[in-house]
């Protein structure tokens, strides 16, 4: 698998490519299946439909890896938190966590056993996927998941989380530790179900100041990665902490690929990290609105990463109103332009 080879810094015939949120709303085929499912969470829980939408970008765009269709918040959902998705405001937890008693009500022993719909989707997708295409499993970072559990929804300033971080850091560490133990088991089950690689999304990394990022986020991601790498050395682990270009000097640990978001200069990440890790990223998603912008962006990134281990991706998820034709053009351009 070209994607897996690139993760391990092995030579590849061209630069492999996939896109975050590639199974998503820009595809009419996805919208059709989502309509049949009824709503987003029902689609996540219907393993046949989740598998179908995971495979769509492979069939339509010929990307080099599929990522399983799911959501990072199915983990706290199965730990016992009441999750719903509100139109216009995204995920909502009706009973956010603010005390140790709230945390102790959550089931960390059986949560990973209740996520069979994710494992079934992985099994089915791996069966249907051609042998040269990789299947990526994923989870959110403990910090990013915790922000939703504590805030009760998305947040602009993470005031409740940060209040806890500075007033009651022990409680926040307990929440993060509980999540970390569940996520280890969850990812292990994903690997057993057929995931060839794992990505940990730390979408809200940039909410933390320098030293707090390493204490409350990065160290927990490394604990998960160390667990996976000790048991499954052939499974690459990708870390994607978004928006931390100022923190790259302290990035170190046992993982394989570092995801670079579009706000981080790729040459900076290359100079600081490419001797240790394959880099993934980092085209500005809005370039996909225009073919000239795509061409310019692709050329720039391929030049920056020449002779370095690289997986092409966007620097964040593809947007819902990107024309499919432009997405196809982007994928093909990367594969053809980077051919050795």
Curated annotation (Swiss-Prot):
InterPro entries: UROD/MetE-like_sf, Uroporphyrinogen_deCO2ase_HemE, Uroporphyrinogen_deCOase. It is found in: Cytoplasm. Signal peptide: none annotated. It catalyses: uroporphyrinogen III + 4 H(+) = coproporphyrinogen III + 4 CO2. CDD domains: URO-D. Substrate binds at residues 21-25, 71, 148, 203, 316. One of its GO terms (molecular function) is uroporphyrinogen decarboxylase activity. GO terms for cellular component: cytosol. Homodimer. Catalyzes the decarboxylation of four acetate groups of uroporphyrinogen-III to yield coproporphyrinogen-III. This is Uroporphyrinogen decarboxylase. It comes from Campylobacter jejuni (strain RM1221). The lineage of its organism: Bacteria, Pseudomonadati, Campylobacterota, Epsilonproteobacteria, Campylobacterales. The gene is hemE.
């Amino acid at each position: 698998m070209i994607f897996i080879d690139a993760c391990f810094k092995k030579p590849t015939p061209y630069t492999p490519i996939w896109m975050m949120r590639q199974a998503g709303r820009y595809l009419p085929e996805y919208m059709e299946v989502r309509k049949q499912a009824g709503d987003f969470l029902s689609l996540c829980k219907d393993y046949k439909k989740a598998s179908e939408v995971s495979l769509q970008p492979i069939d339509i765009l010929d990307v080099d890896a599929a990522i399983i269709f799911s959501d990072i918040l199915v983990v706290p959902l199965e730990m016992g938190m009441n999750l719903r998705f509100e139109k216009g405001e995204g995920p909502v937890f009706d009973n956010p966590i603010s005390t140790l008693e709230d945390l102790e009500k959550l089931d960390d022993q059986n949560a990973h056993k209740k996520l069979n719909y994710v494992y079934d989707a992985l099994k089915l997708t791996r069966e249907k996927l051609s042998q040269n295409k990789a299947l990526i499993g994923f989870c959110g970072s403990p910090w990013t998941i915790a922000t939703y559990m504590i805030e009760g929804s998305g947040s602009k300033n993470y005031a409740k989380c940060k209040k806890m971080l500075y007033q009651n850091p022990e409680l926040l560490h307990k929440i993060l530790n509980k999540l970390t133990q569940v996520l280890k088991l969850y990812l292990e089950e994903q690997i057993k179900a057929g995931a060839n690689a794992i990505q940990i999304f730390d979408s809200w990394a940039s909410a933390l100041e320098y030293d707090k990022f390493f204490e409350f986020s990065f160290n927990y991601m490394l604990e998960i990665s160390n667990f996976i790498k000790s048991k499954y050395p052939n499974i690459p682990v990708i870390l994607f902490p978004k928006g931390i270009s100022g923190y790259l000097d302290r990035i170190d640990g046992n993982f394989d690929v570092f995801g670079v978001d579009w706000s981080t200069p790729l040459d900076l990440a290359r100079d600081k990290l490419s001797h240790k890790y394959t880099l993934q990223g980092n085209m500005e998603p809005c370039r996909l609105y225009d073919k000239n912008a795509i061409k310019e962006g692709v050329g720039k990134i391929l030049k920056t990463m020449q002779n370095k281990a690289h997986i092409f991706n966007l620097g964040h998820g593809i947007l819902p109103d990107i024309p499919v034709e432009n997405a196809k053009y982007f994928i093909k351009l990367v594969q053809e332009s980077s051919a050795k």
